[in-house]
Amino acid sequence: MATETETVVEETEESVQQIPMIEANGLSKFYGIFAATREVSFKVFKGEVVAFLGPNGAGKSTTMKILTGYLSPSQGVARIAGFDMNTDRLAGSRKLGYLPETGPLYPEMTPYSLLDFFAEARGMNKATKRYRIEKAVDLCALNSVIYKPINKLSKGYRQRVGMAQALIHEPDVLILDEPTSGLDPNQIRGVRQTMKRLGQEKTILLSTHILQEVEAMADRVVMINEGRKVYDGKLEDIDPTHQGLDAVFANLTGLDAETGVKLDNEIDED
């Protein structure tokens, strides 16, 4: 029989587990009469890897920019680790690592000098910088290229450098926008391996329009189409009739999973 102390500890751990590390609450973004997103709501909890899936033009990047504080919502609230990213962005940013689709890389720098620059900008002392850089380099498997100019690296390695930059301050939350975009199969495998390592200790939201990425890296999927959320659930629950994820995606969005085409209309780029 559990003691009173053990019961309190279990309840405390359970309550911590239920605090959302990423929260989108009714997020809408309007440009004149055009709505990039409409009332998008979802939560990502500690230890989850969640795929944010949708065709190009669905509103994924807009939602991620709002979640990271780079864009203010027209309506709704975005929170990181409980901090409102519109009114308390600095506190939220300390908990957040963000990799946009085009990462903040300086081609003339080496991965080491870039990471040192970002660590310095975050006010780390010499010992902390050394430790954080070594840890980020190990997590992202950059040891073999750490002193090579970034403009000499493959796109796969540049993507890993971007991830290392997002990790330099040891954030609890990672938001990654199309982390495998434009990579070849070998580079994609490398990024997937990095994601598996990171998923053991971080809360991760990654956007993608590639169904295979969801199956390879995520525990749960949030699906968006035409600016609206159309699905939010566990991977094991999304396909109870075993049609395959392609068929489920087509049923929910009305789009062909491979071409992104609805009837005869091309989907615009995000």
Label for each model-derived stretch:
Residues 168-172, 201:
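A short, proline-enriched helix->beta-strand linker immediately N-terminal to the Walker B motif
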Residues 232-233:
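ABC ATPase "signature
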Residues 188-200:
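Helical segment within the ABC ATPase nucleotide-binding domain
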Residues 116, 120, 127-145:
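Conserved ABC ATPase "signature" region
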Residues 174-178:
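Catalytic Walker B motif of ABC-type/P-loop ATPase nucleotide-binding domains
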Residues 214-216:
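A short, surface-exposed alpha-helical micro-motif characterized by mixed small hydrophobic
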